[in-house]
From Swiss-Prot:
Its EC number is 2.7.7.6. Keywords: DNA-directed RNA polymerase, Nucleotidyltransferase, Transcription, Transferase. The keyword Nucleotidyltransferase applies. GO terms for molecular function: DNA binding; DNA-directed RNA polymerase activity; protein dimerization activity. The keyword Transferase applies. This is DNA-directed RNA polymerase subunit alpha. It catalyses: RNA(n) + a ribonucleoside 5'-triphosphate = RNA(n+1) + diphosphate. SMART domains: RPOLD (SM00662). It holds the Pfam family RNA_pol_A_CTD. Residues 1-233 are annotated as: Alpha N-terminal domain (alpha-NTD). Residues 246-340 are annotated as: Alpha C-terminal domain (alpha-CTD). GO terms for biological process: DNA-templated transcription. The N-terminal domain is essential for RNAP assembly and basal transcription, whereas the C-terminal domain is involved in interaction with transcriptional regulators and with upstream promoter elements.
Length: 340
């Protein structure tokens, strides 16, 4: 029965675009997948990212001198309805707590922004420039807000607390820290076969969670939800046969071969020479994005090299912590001397 999943192609590793990775955006790649698996996983991860990750949001507000949301505040341009709408756009992060109270007090002319909120060490404002209200000369604006942890969207009715002080107005809350998720499917090559899938995921967040962490959390959620469907003891499963030492040595030796042995086109070979890349190990440690930044190195050269590396069981973006190994270099040099 183990062949049901052991014979399937599995992605080698998760890669990401280093140049664009930030606290609010990440672009991730995984390949190869059996045909159809990338679509299944991409769609599932997207739904979980958008709906199931925990975040923080303002759930209620109390403004001094205001009893309901249809009131106006003396000296303030926006009415209470507009202020509540602005509060829904405030992005926050709670540290070590699930609920907190924040407040703001402003007297006189000026603009109130999210960065003006008085918060404790357990609350962090992710968009401090977000507009809240515009005050005139005779304004005295005083407001207390409750911040809670949650997921997805929660309506004002569900945020209503019967024990809250008079004048407390519950508001709709959008807890999700994920702004947007896109995924695309393209072809991936395994040896001479090109009918496999490559999954590309783009994740935008509000900064309260990093894109790579958000992806990891969503994968963990999916794994936990699927675990009940496994009706056998996974620990009793015999280990899959490991690669033979000969196969490992062959891959290792390929890393120490020169790029000249790849028999590349003149243009590609010159690009690698100008970039100072001599060994295949140096080449595969580069990401595709890094290679495309090499002078005169284009997509055509990239695809040419990818095809050749794939036939050798190698790919761009490999993590070679122990490369180069002095013993391996001496060994290969010795073999070359014997041949001469």
């Amino acid at each position: 029965m183990y062949k049901n999943w052991r014979d399937l192609i599995r992605p080698k590793q998760l890669q990401f675009e280093k140049e664009s990775l930030s606290d609010t955006y990440g672009k991730f790649f995984a390949e190869p997948f059996e045909r159809g698996f990338a679509t299944t996983l991409g769609n599932s991860l997207r739904r979980i990212l958008l709906s199931s990750l925990q975040g923080s949001a303002i759930t209620s507000v109390r403004i001094k001198g205001v009893l309901h949301e249809f009131s106006a505040i003396q000296g303030v341009t926006e009415d209470v309805t507009d202020i509540i709408l602005n509060l829904k756009g405030v992005r926050l992060k709670l540290h070590s707590v699930v609920q907190a109270t924040i407040r703001v007090v402003h007297t006189g002319e000026g603009v109130v922004k999210a960065g003006d909120f008085v918060v404790g060490h357990n609350v962090e404002i992710m968009n401090p420039e977000h507009h809240i209200a515009t005050c005139g000369k005779d304004a005295h604006f005083e407001m207390d807000m409750t911040v809670k942890m949650g997921k997805g969207y929660v309506s004002a009715d569900k945020n209503r607390d019967e024990k809250a002080p008079v004048g407390t107005i519950p508001i709709d809350s959008i807890f999700s820290p994920i702004k947007k998720v896109n995924f695309t499917i393209s072809n991936a090559r395994v040896g001479q076969m090109t009918d496999y899938d490559k999954l590309t995921l783009e994740i935008w967040t509000d900064g309260s969670v990093k894109p790579d962490d958000a992806l990891a959390y969503s994968a963990k959620i999916m794994k936990e939800q699927l675990s009940i469907f496994i009706n056998f003891d996974e620990e009793a499963e015999p280990q899959a046969p490991e690669e033979s030492q000969d196969e490992i040595d062959k891959i290792n030796e390929n890393l120490y071969r020169t790029v000249e042995e790849l028999e590349l086109s003149v243009r590609s070979a010159n690009c690698l020479k100008n970039a100072g890349i001599k060994l295949i190990g140096e080449l595969v440690s580069k990401t595709e994005a890094e290679m495309l930044k090499t002078q005169n190195f284009g997509r055509k050269s990239l695809n040419e090299i990818k095809d050749i590396l794939s036939d050798m069981g190698l790919t761009f973006g490999m993590k070679l912590d122990s490369f180069p190994e002095p013993d391996m270099l001496r060994r290969l040099r010795g073999e070359q001397n014997e041949e001469e």
